[in-house]
């Protein structure tokens, strides 16, 4: 959706539920606040780029400004934009209610990575760097691996890249490997290796079958 899409969705449901106008007013204030926050970052990146003498650093500042301009209203279209969008959401949600729950990191970001690779917009090393930057931004809880609703494995090359990004960061992360009975033992061993190598308490491990049964007990369909 992007921030602009969220505003459109709020406007749509405001018309359907005018009795909840106060609620929608509050939601719109939050989104506009985040957009204002992003706008300041764009302005500061451009200001720093004007005085930066190192060409690589100047180019990165200009890219930061453009990435944030792209997601100010629109939905993310590249992996870098997706990571940047999540960074803003993480910071805003922490401020709002100390939220720490993330998502299935490998599955969500993989679609952007695959599209970028197809178009030649990114390299594997750049993607790992973006993952490390995202993990540095905030220790939100993320899952990797496990199975989908049909019991098929979600593990992919990108799952390995998440571990590599966390390894390069070499700091506290909140990554959990979903362990199912058919998990690729090579991946599981690699995850355990990182746990002992870095001694930073990651990754954690969660039994996928018990997790899924718990969700079903709460009313989620099989």
Give the location of each predicted region:
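Conserved catalytic cores of very large enzyme subunits
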Residues: 1-27, 56, 60-63, 67-74, ...
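Heptad-repeat amphipathic alpha-helical coiled-coil interaction surface used
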Residues: 35, 42, 46-49, 58, ...
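Extended non-globular scaffold/tether segments
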Residues: 28-36
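Hydrophobic side-chain positions on well-ordered alpha-helices
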Residues: 45-50, 112-116
């Amino acid at each position: 959706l992007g921030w602009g899409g969220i505003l459109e969705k709020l406007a749509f449901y405001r018309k359907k539920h005018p009795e909840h106008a106060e609620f929608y007013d509050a939601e719109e204030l939050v989104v506009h606040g985040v957009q204002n926050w992003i706008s300041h970052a764009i302005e500061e990146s451009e200001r720093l780029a004007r005085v930066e003498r190192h060409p690589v650093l100047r180019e990165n500042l200009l890219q930061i400004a453009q990435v944030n301009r792209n997601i100010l209203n629109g939905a993310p279209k590249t992996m870098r934009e997706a990571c940047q969008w999540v960074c803003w959401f993480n910071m805003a949600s922490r401020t709002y209610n100390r939220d720490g729950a993330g998502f299935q990191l490998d599955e969500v970001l993989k679609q952007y990575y695959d599209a970028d690779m197809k178009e030649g917009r990114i390299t594997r090393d750049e993607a790992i760097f973006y993952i490390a930057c995202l993990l540095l931004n905030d220790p939100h809880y993320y899952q990797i691996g496990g199975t989908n609703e049909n019991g098929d494995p979600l593990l992919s090359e990108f799952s390995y890249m998440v571990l590599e990004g966390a390894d390069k960061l070499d700091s506290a992360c909140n990554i959990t490997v979903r362990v199912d009975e058919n998990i690729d033992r090579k991946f599981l061993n690699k995850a355990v290796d990182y746990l002992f190598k870095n001694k930073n308490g990651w990754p954690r491990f969660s039994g996928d079958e018990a997790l899924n049964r718990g969700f079903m007990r709460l009313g989620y369909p099989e």
